[in-house]
Amino acid sequence: MDATAVLHKTDADAHITVEDLTMAYGDFVIQHDLNFTIGRGDIFIIMGGSGCGKSTLLRHMIGLKAPARGNVLFDGISYWDTTPVEQQRIKRSFGTSFQSGAMWSSLTLAENVALPLSEYTDLAPADITEVVSLKLSLVGLSGFEEFYPSEISGGMQKRAALARAIALDPEILFFDEPSAGLDPISSRRLDDLILELRDSLGTTIVVVTHELASIFTIGDNAVFLDAETRTMIASGDPRTLRDESPDPGVRRFLNRGEI
C-alpha cells in the first residue's frame, strides 16, 4: 500500500464503501447523497428504472468519473483522495465487463483475453497462452481460442468478455447490464456463471441491471436508485425489498409482471 494512501474508518466487513456520493454533470444532479457498503464476496445489484443513473454510478465506482461530492472507498482507502500510484493499484484489482462486451473484432478470443496479460504482466508468451486457456475454460469456451467474436453467439461473446475481465484475477468484478441483448436461456447461463465465479473465487461482484430474473437469482444485496427524487430510496436483500419495502415504487419495480 502507498504510504500516502488515505484511510477512512469503515465497516470491518466492507470491501467497497460509497460515502455521501453526489453525481452531477455541471449543475445537473443525477443522484445525491448515496451511502451504502458492499461486503467482501457479495454480489451487489445496482437497480432502478431507465435513466436513473445506474451506469453513471458504476463509472464513478471504477474511477472513470470524479464525484461532485463524496467518495468511494476500497478496503477503507479513499480512491479520490489518494495518490495516482495508489489509484492505479486499486484499479488493478478490478475486472470490468461493459454492456457492449467491447471485444476487439480483429482479434481472436485468445488474443482478446491475452491483452491485459500482455499489458500488465511480465509473463512469458507460453505462460500467457496457458492462462488464457484456463480463463476461457472457466467460462465454458475451451476449444474456441481461435474463433473471432463475429463467429460466435451473443451469449458466447459475453462469456468471452468475462474471461478477459478475470484474466488478471481481480478482487472485484463490475458488470454493466450483462444480460442486455441476450435471450432468457443465455441470460440464465450467464447468471449461473457469475454465481460460480463468486463461489469458486470469492470475488466481490457489482452488477448494474434492471432484469428481475438476474436480480433475484444472483443478488445478495442491492441499492435502488430513483430517477424522480434523484437519490437511493431502498437498499438490502432484493427479495426482502420486493415483499416488504415501504416504498410503493420499489415494490412496483420488483413485482413487474406479477398478477
Region roles according to the model:
Residues 77, 125-143:
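Conserved ABC ATPase "signature" region
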Residues 167-171:
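A short, proline-enriched helix->beta-strand linker immediately N-terminal to the Walker B motif
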Residues 148-152, 156:
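Conserved ABC ATPase signature
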